[in-house]
Regions:
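Short hydrophobic alpha-helices and adjacent helix-cap/hinge residues
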Residues: 1-294
């Protein structure tokens, strides 16, 4: 029976696991019936990913599914032969996972979430809620260097003053928010990162504690009390990763499977959080929302 290795930063999440399994099932694969899995999860500790990737490779899996930039790179460094399906935030060509989007080459393919290209839109959204010329804080994982450089370039091109606070692991989050508060930022842009998604409840709680409006990439943040998100569907990306995994199980080569990019994006606003922050969401913004959480 084929084995799928699962490598991720966070803990198990039933919603995300179910999305991946739906993608597999679309192509006729069901865990426990005709395919099995070996999961390795770093539980928020980036330093564990390299060793966990090596562990998975030593089990001779049929393929590896890696969620997040650092996990994908760890898997790629651990093997050049085992097929890899990734879900990442960055340009896979820039970070060395693929030769190009149409024909990746090598042993890795998957889904790129177009994070940096959405930053300008998210900046525009948050600027509708804060005073002109306000400083915006950026919470980012320093391991995502390409993403940081792209966001800083976007900020410069728009004249946006940016205070960068770095957080690599969960213990870094409180000091990062303390830095942003000290810098008197008016709002926070939370960068896309698998660790941030895994720690979303803590990040949302910190933003609330410090009365900071924050915008995020995915609806999973406003679902737990974050103010606003704009971006693609995580569940949709994982479901697509499931279909790619199934194609590889059927004999497709990663080098021939084009890297997918999302084409649909959703604006989600948590109106309860807005009221608690004393923010009046403009009617024009509410009308553009795909979902308003009461």
């Amino acid at each position: 029976m084929p084995v799928i290795g699962m490598l991720s930063l966070g803990s198990a999440t039933s919603e995300f696991d179910a999305a991946f399994e739906r993608g597999l099932a679309e192509r006729g694969y069901v865990f426990g019936k005709n395919v099995t899995k070996e999961a390795r999860r770093a539980r928020g500790n980036y330093d564990k990913l390299a060793q966990l990737a090596k562990e998975l490779v030593s089990l001779n899996p049929t393929l590896i599914v890696a969620s997040g930039n650092v996990a994908a790179l760890a898997a790629r460094r651990a093997t050049s032969t085992v097929p890899i399906v990734f879900i990442i935030a960055s340009d896979p060509v820039k970070i060395g996972l693929a030769k190009n989007l149409a024909r990746p080459g090598g042993n890795a393919t998957g889904i790129s979430m177009l994070t940096a290209t959405l930053t300008l839109k998210r900046l525009e959204l948050i600027r509708e809620l804060v005073p002109p010329n306000a400083t915006v804080g950026l919470l980012i994982n320093p391991d995502n260097k390409d993403l940081l450089l792209e966001i800083e370039e976007i900020a410069r091109s728009t004249g946006q003053s940016l205070e960068v606070a770095e957080a690599r692991n969960p213990d870094d989050l409180e000091p990062a928010f303390a830095q942003l508060v000290k810098a008197q930022v008016s709002a926070v842009l939370v960068g896309n990162d698998a660790g941030f998604l895994a720690q979303r409840a803590q990040i949302v709680a910190l933003a609330k504690r410090h009365s900071l409006p924050a915008t995020y990439e995915f609806r999973e943040f406003p679902a737990v009390g974050g103010l606003m998100s704009y971006g693609p569907s995580v569940a949709g990306a994982l479901q697509k990763a499931g279909t790619y995994a199934a194609l590889i199980l059927k004999g497709a080569q990663p080098s021939d499977l084009p890297i997918e990019q999302p084409t649909a994006f959703e604006l989600v606003i948590n109106s309860t959080t807005a009221r608690s922050l004393g923010i009046q969401i403009p009617a024009s913004l509410l009308l553009r929302a795909n979902e308003v959480i009461e």
